[in-house]
Amino acid sequence: LSADNTLRRLQLILLLAFVVPRANAQWPQLGANPSHSGKVTVAAQPLLHLMSNIVYDPFVAQEQAAFNGDLYVHYQVPLVDDDGVYMEFKSGTFATPEHWETQNWSVHGLRWQDGALVDRWTAPSDWKPVPANGAAFFEPVFHSVLANGFLYMPGAGGTLMQIDRSDGHLVKRINPFSFLDPNIYVSGVPAADAAGTIYYGAFGLDAANPWNKDITGAWLVKVQPDGSSRAIPFASLVPNAPKPTDQCTYVFGVNASRPLPPSPSAVAPTIQCGGVRPGINAAPAIAADGTIYVVGVTNFNPFWSYLAAVNTDLTPKWSASLRNRFHDGCGVLVPYGTTSHNCRAGAAIGVDPNDNQPGSGVVSDDSTSSPVVLPDGSVLYGTYSGYNGVRGHLTHFSSSGVFVASYDFGWDITPAVWEHDGTWSIVIKENFYVAPEKYFITQLDANLKPEWQFKSTNTQACGRGPDGNVTCVDEQPNGFEWCVNAPAIDSRGVVYVNSEDGNLYAIGQGGIIQEKIFLQLALGAGYTPLSIGPDGKIYAQNAGHLFAVGGSLPRVHAVRH
C-alpha cells in the first residue's frame, strides 16, 4: 500500500472506532437496543445539574386526584439521538379515568440550544388506547421508536405513522390491514431490529362491547424499512394456547372459604379462555440472530400467558407457557396459618393458594415488562404473580424455549443487562410491598443469583420551593419504592434508577451509591424508564415531567441510525 492509502485506511479505522460506539450510545427505543439490554457505550455525565424540566403530561394533578394521589399512567422512555430528544406529550382534555380516550397524544422533537432543551416540532397522532374498564387499569403507554432516520409512532387502527425527524411532518401512514378500522389498536411498544425492521402487536375489539366479547383478531406486525408491512395472526405464533372457547382454570372466587385453598383438595373454577393476543404494554425483543420474542395472554383469563419465539419470516419457532412454572407458594413464601394471608393447613407445599396449583406467571396488561435477550441468546421476562406479595417472578428461558430458572420478583420490570468479564449481570428493582416494606435495586448473576443489593434507606420526603430550595420532612420509616420499570446502565456499569423519594440515583458496582440528585417527590407515581444520550446526559421522568440531568462534559456528534 502507498503511504497515502495507508494514511486514509488509518483515518477510516479511527473514524469507525469513534462513530460506532457513539451510534451505539443512542437510545432509539425501549431498552436502548433490539435486545432491550438498557446499556450504552458511553459514561453518563455527573449528576450535577437539573438541565431541563419539561411538563409533558398536563393532567397529572387530575389523574392523581382520581386515585387519592396515585398516578396510574404509563409513559414512554425519552428517545435520544445525536440531533435531540423525542418525547410523548399529552393534550386534549382529561375527563375521567374511565374515558382516557378524550386525551390526545403526540411526539415533540426537542433540541439542545444554548443550554436549554427547546421544542422544535410537534407530530400529532390519532392513536387511542384500548377502551378503559377492561383488561388495563393503568392508562396504556403510547410509545415511539427511532429507525431508518425516521420516528415511527402508533396511529389509529393499528397503524404506524412515519415521521420526518427534522421537522415532524407525516411521511406516510403504514397500514398492514385492508382498511383503517378504528376498533383495531396498537398493542404495546414498537421495537426495531438492527436493520431497521419494526415489529409490534395489534388486536381488535368489539365496538359496542369491547371487554365482554372476545377479541375480533390479534396480530404481530412486521414493517420493513421501505414501509411495506405484513400482519400475521398472533394465534399462529402460540399454537399451544387453548382455543378461544375452551374453559381454562381460573382462581377461587371472593366468596371462597379463607384461608385459601378452600380445602387441600379444592379445584379452582374454570372460565372461558378467550383468544390469545399480545400484552397491551409489552414490546417485542429481537435477538442477534433475528429471532423475535413476544408475550401473549388469553383475553379473558390472564393466568394463561405465553412467551413465544418467532422467526424473521413470522413463522413460529417455539412457544412456552408461563403457567405452573413456580413451586414457591404454600409453605415456602406463603406460610401456613389461619388468616386470609396464609395457606390452609394441609395444602400441598409450593402451590399457589389462589388456584391450588403450581404458581403461574401472568402477562399483566398493567405491566410494561418486555422480553430481554441475554448475550447467549436466552431470554428474560418479568411476570406478575399475586401470592408472593404481588411481586411477580422474573423468568429465564433458553434460546430453544426450555425453562431455566426464575427469581422472586418480576413485576413491571424490563431488566437491564451489563456485560463484563466474559459474563453478564442483570439489574432489576425489587420492592417488597407487604409489611415489613423494604425496597432494593438488585443485581443478579447470569444464573439469577443475587450479586449485590442497594436498599432504599432515605426516610425524608422532600419538596422544591419556588425559590429552588429543597426542604424535607421525615415521614417514610421504611424508605421509598423504586419507581423504575427499565433501568439504564452506562459503560462503567453504573446503574441509573429513579425513586419515589424524587431522587435520581447513580449506583456503582457492588451496590455503592455514587451520586443522587433531587428531581421532585413522586409518591404513588407510576414506574418509568430512563435513558442516556450519546453525550452522557441522563433523561429521567417523574409525575409527568421530563428531566435532563448532567454536568459539563462536551457533546460529541454521532451518526443517526
Model feature map: region roles:
Residues L1-Q11:
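Bacterial N-terminal signal peptides that target proteins for export
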Residues N5-T6, V19, H557:
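Intrinsically disordered, low-complexity regions enriched in serine, threonine, proline
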Residues R9-V19:
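Bacterial N-terminal signal peptides
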